[in-house]
């Protein structure tokens, strides 16, 4: 019997979550520039890591496609001008603003590092809940536009 370690290789780990502001309609229902500005402000305040804030309206199509290919934004956000991306300096944490949900945060790290990813996103979520009233229902939990 041979020991085939190729079956045990983990290329990357990802943890992500979606959060919505309690008093702002989901993006599919229509959202104003002022509401997106509020979400950007909250997302930025919640970040306790070095990061850049990029507005989708400032990006060329080729830059948007590069971010999609690097799994930092979704194809849906790439099509929008009214949205933003907050990205950590090491590219491990990306926060999409005004995608399917108001805030879509993710952490991606190489290898099998789910706990590290979870810890980073959990900390961000804790910080976000301090600066934004998050849409939550006692029966259904966090309210989201997308159940995945």
Describe each PLM feature range.
Residues 1-139:
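Long, Pro/Ser/Thr-rich low-complexity/intrinsically disordered regulatory tracts in eukaryotic proteins
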Residues 140-147:
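Conserved phosphate/anionic-ligand binding catalytic regions in large, soluble enzymes, centered on
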